[in-house]
Amino acid sequence: MKKITHTYSNPKQAVLPILIQDYLDICDPVLTFDRFMGEIDLEKYLKEIPKHEVGRLRYNPVSMLKTILFGFMTNGYVSLRELEDSCKVNLRFMYLMDHEVPSYRTFGYFINEILSDSIEKLFCDINQKIFEKEHTDLQHLYIDGSKFEANANKYSWVWKKATEKSRYRLFEKITSLFQEINLELQYTGIKFRINTEYSPEYLKEAASKYVEIWQLDEATFVAGKGHRKSVQQRHYEKLKEYLSKLNEYVEKIQICGDGRNSYSKTDHSATFMRIKKDYMGNDQLLPAYNVQVGVADEYIAVVDVNQYRSDMDCFIPLMNKFHDIYGFYPKYPVADADYGSYNNYIFCEQNGLEKYMKFPMFKKETTDRNYHEYPFRAVNFKIDGDGKMRCPNGKGFHLQYRKAIKENAYGREEEIYQCEDCSGCPYAEKCKKGEGNRTVRVNQELTKMHQEVIQNLESIQGALLRMNRSIQAEGTFGIIKNDRWYKRIVRRGIKSVQLEVYLVSLGHNLYKFHNKQMKIKSAA
């Protein structure tokens, strides 16, 4: 008979950990992070927490704030469930939370209800602490923008112009209906006013008045097979239908506002834009946000979330935000050709900023010699002693009129000149396209600005700044998107998206700060 024996010994002894940091390396990111955050008064951002007199004790809000920021520092973007799971199994998060494990709902409440109002101030204070330690140069700001796809359905667009066209077609239907009603009421002496446009309030008032005139009761209305609606019922139901449609159109136009032409039904703050990475393969517009950053010494000094498709419209809000944070404007804002507009150059002149933003034709102007020296361009026409512009054939150009540029904040005007006589000109084929005398549009002020920008950017300093911008500003988005895997907005609504982008930017800056500190230690 086989003898069966059991071994009850356990070679693994129970170990009581005294301090979690004993298990962490001395250069561990969480220790660098904790020492740095200990120098900042975090409690002043947590004063708005409502007090509860019943229930379990609240989690330490300072520890929760540190845990959230550290999650964004290490992961680039961290979800609420990842935070909860990390507090259970990750020593770094256990160290920050002191072995407590808040649920993902608790983290969500903390971020949305407590951090949303103070995140911008927290971003500013952490940045200023980093910049003070790193002696960051804020006079040179490298600017870039990138479009991040919103968390919205792809085919959920609402177009402002299409809505306006539908509204005008509805106005025509309302006019026809009022004409029928007035014909119906011609013997009563009552008449509804007919306009080219109608407001929902007027339509609502007209419907109420129509009910009062005919003493209509909706409970007596008929519907379905075998029933014939009265004229009054049909007119009243049409009024109600048109009122509902008009309210819908008005709401859509109000959501779009003056600054954009579209929005998404599933995220009203998202605007449809063309994104560089067309993964759908059909050149389709996608709901997105335009995220702008100003980078100084590899740190994100200022960040802004916009609903504008063009980067030109984002420059002035970004500079004003920088001024609100630091109390001054950067001396050298360096940006690519998407930012070089008349409005932005005038803003720089008024606020003491140097013009280091390219304009749209900068590359062609500086690299294509044939284009730059082309004699038939209006900017290359000679000016005679009387100040008159003359073409290569010696013909003078006379000022016809001045035209205001649409949507220009500083009253920019274009001057329209026409040649005195182009008949029989040997250069006509190269100089003009039409049959009449050549007409040119000139803005001398903008031309001088372009020459100043070329002079700035073609200098040795300008070349170094351009190179640095491509490394730092574009490199920042490269790190965020490809190294730290934050490629798409998760939250919905402009305020929530701004909160999310601030957290990602804070995580990036803390991540950079830790890496630089480690490089200094390894060099020593």
Please report, for each region that a protein language model flagged, where it lies by residue.
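Hydrophobic alpha-helical membrane-insertion signals
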Residues: 1-31
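A ubiquitous short alpha-helical element
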Residues: 1-5, 51-55, 461-464
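Basic, short loop/linker segments at the boundary and entry of helix-turn-helix/winged-helix-like folds
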Residues: 26-66, 72
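General structural signal for alpha-helix termini and helix-helix connectors
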Residues: 51, 70-73, 93, 113
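A short glycine/serine-rich beta->alpha loop
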Residues: 51-57, 93, 491-493
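Anion-binding and metal-coordination hotspots
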Residues: 68, 76-89, 100-524
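Short arginine-rich
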Residues: 94-98
